[in-house]
Amino acid sequence: MQRLDLATIAPTPWKNGGGATRALACWPPGAGLERFGWRVSVADVAAPGPFSLYPGVDRQILLLQGDGVHLRAADGSVDQALDRATPPFAFAGETAIDCTLRGGPVRDFNLMLRRGQWRGALRVWHGACTPGESPAGLCLVLAGHWERAGEAYAPGQGLWWSTPRPGVPLRPVPGGLDHPALAWVALEPEI
């Protein structure tokens, strides 16, 4: 189980130059964009433009901050508005998607899965959960304060794992002003 903190991860410019990404975790560790089995990141989108293409990769996106985006594919297969109330949206990485901003810059959470190698789901979770229940995964605090085995977790902090080792639950700390929320990713190998 590895602890992570978004504030300590340096941003990397996108392949298409329209924003920057902070890679939270990937498998295998240190794998580049052409070799990962799965990858989880947080992106800052500063300008409208096309998404980078990732053939053979299934993607899921969740808006975290900002007024929202509208995703459209030239072939009509995608026409989706996303805001902070929208559940995670899944699409194929080889689909040519254009992104327009519905206001200013936005921040989103991204899950990318190499098709035929990994499958998984991105959800927003509000109650206690147990990291390590799935073969691999990641959780990131989005709102509220959380606690696990006496360690505090604030927004932007979390855990990732690559082997199933259920252990101590991660729980929201009662009494906070924010409604507690986690980005929760559960992953399983397909092969």
Predicted regions and their residues:
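A short glycine-rich, His/Asp/Glu-containing loop-to-beta-strand
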Residues: K15-G49, D58, I97-C129
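Cytosolic regulatory regions built on CNB/CRP/Popeye-like sensor folds
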Residues: M1-A23, F36, V40, G68, ...
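Short, structured patches in soluble enzyme cores that scaffold and shape functional sites
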Residues: P28, D44, Q65, A73, ...
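Glycine- and acidic-residue-biased ligand/ion/polar-headgroup-sensing regions
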Residues: V57-A74, G132-G150, G156
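Short acidic-glycine-tyrosine-enriched beta hairpin
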Residues: D5, P13, D75-A96, H126-P131, ...
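Short, well-structured hydrophobic secondary-structure segments
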Residues: A43-D44, P48-A92
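Ligand-binding loop in jelly-roll beta-barrel domains
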Residues: R84-W118, T163-I191
